[in-house]
């Protein structure tokens, strides 16, 4: 099974960077487009992000465990991500969960949330976020600067993103060099 996943990853490794570029630069992502189109584009980008991130083996409690995406307080994004539950990620089924900052069990691989939710999580559950290798994604100004791994943003009427490489390292995540090359900017926190 591992050999098959490695073979598929190697075979299609050239394809995913181009798909990510296409999603980011898609002309239909202008500000004038409907919110539903923008949410669909963000969903595609979130799915593409996961292809470019490597989680440590201990991020999956069991070999058959689901790849879990949590969404805090954003019903539109939760609904947009639900169709991903029919797909697979890194050999795992995908599960979409309506999450909360009060959750005690952080079994998420990706967590989409606001800056306010992230700040609350960092105050109360920072150790769990890092120990569970959670890739945090948000859109608010200052999201990456406040410890989020990826911030989605509109840049010249196109969807782009910022990476906080220190937050990714703290979470034990390995981001592909393709992500770094496509990022609008890369932040590194001071020690």
Describe each model-derived feature in a short phrase.
Residues 2-21, 25-191:
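Short hydrophobic alpha-helices and adjacent helix-cap/hinge residues
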């Amino acid at each position: 099974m591992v050999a098959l996943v490695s073979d598929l990853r190697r075979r299609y490794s050239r394809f995913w960077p181009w798909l990510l570029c296409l999603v980011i630069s898609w002309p239909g992502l202008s500000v004038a487009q409907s919110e539903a189109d923008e949410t669909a584009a963000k969903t595609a980008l979130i799915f593409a992000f996961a292809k470019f991130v490597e989680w440590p083996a201990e991020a999956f409690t069991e070999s058959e465990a689901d790849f879990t995406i949590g969404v805090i307080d954003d019903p539109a994004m939760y609904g947009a991500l639900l169709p991903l539950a029919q797909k697979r990620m890194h050999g795992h089924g995908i599960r979409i969960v309506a999450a909360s900052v009060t959750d005690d069990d952080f079994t998420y691989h990706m967590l989409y949330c606001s800056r306010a939710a992230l700040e609350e999580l960092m105050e109360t559950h920072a150790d769990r976020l890092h120990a569970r290798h959670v890739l945090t994604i948000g859109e608010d100004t200052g999201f990456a600067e406040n410890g989020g791994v990826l911030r989605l943003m509109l840049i010249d009427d196109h969807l782009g993103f910022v990476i906080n490489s220190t937050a990714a390292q703290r979470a034990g995540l390995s981001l592909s060099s393709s992500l770094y090359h496509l990022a609008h900017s890369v932040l590194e926190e001071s020690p």
